């Protein structure tokens, strides 16, 4: 047996008949035991996670890293306390707003000292006040545009005439916007005009009607009108007698006679007494030809004398 065992060569046996080493069997047995032990642990862990998720969904807890939801008091915003202004503070603020709608830092600090407020509160008040003023201006312009009138000076509109009406600084709303009545003025041109010239200037329709008057109706008006025309011509001759005599005795002048600049206001009367008498005898219609003023008959040299 020993010889047989000693003489027996294991290398000549096939691999299937060879005995396996003992350490390989131990490792395989250990791996099998570890896999069997791992499976129930994994199953228990998955079951515990599923139960935790179901409980969280049932209770309505938000899912987070720590499993704890945020504090609801932190989510709610803290409401700022409103500032209640007194009537004196509002009076100072409104008076400043009417003077300047965009005060700088120094002015806001002064207002804060006057009104016993902080500069931040004054700044916020002016910001809100400007927003209200712009909204009111916009509404007024829309109303005026609907009525068919577009204001050209919208910036001159005063804001909020119904607010703080009892204060003295807001008296602009009670002031009358109507202009002062036109005072009686003395016009030297019309006062210096003679009744004849004023009658001749503003009696166009009457003269036209007299010209279109039939000859049968004009007989009674001939003597009176002829006498008034004669008196006017005599007055003009007396006034311009001295100037005409000096013009006749003066030497010749190279300049031509100047034109009268006031041709519109020339007196319309008859040129001579003879033509008036002739027309009055013939009972013709009355047409007044223009009579040159005494100054127009003088030449340029006689103006200097």
From Swiss-Prot:
Residues 74-83 have a biased composition (Basic residues). Keywords: Activator, Developmental protein, DNA-binding, Homeobox, Nucleus, Transcription, Transcription regulation. Its main location: nucleus. This is Pituitary homeobox 1. A motif (Nuclear localization signal) lies at residues 284-288. GO terms for molecular function: DNA-binding transcription factor activity; DNA-binding transcription factor activity, RNA polymerase II-specific; RNA polymerase II cis-regulatory region sequence-specific DNA binding. The keyword Transcription applies. One of its GO terms (cellular component) is nucleus. Residues 138-270 are annotated as: Interaction with PIT-1. Residues 53-66 have a biased composition (Basic and acidic residues). Belongs to the paired homeobox family. Bicoid subfamily. Residues 1-92 are annotated as: Disordered. Pfam families: Homeodomain, OAR. Sequence-specific transcription factor that binds gene promoters and activates their transcription. May play a role in the development of anterior structures, and in particular, the brain and facies and in specifying the identity or structure of hindlimb. It is found in: Nucleus. Signal peptide: none annotated. PANTHER family: PITUITARY HOMEOBOX 1, PITUITARY HOMEOBOX HOMOLOG PTX1. GO terms for biological process: anatomical structure morphogenesis; regulation of transcription by RNA polymerase II. Residues 78-137 bind DNA. InterPro entries: HD (IPR001356), Homeobox_CS (IPR017970), Homeobox_Pitx/unc30 (IPR016233), Homeodomain-like_sf (IPR009057), OAR_dom (IPR003654). A motif (OAR) lies at residues 271-284.
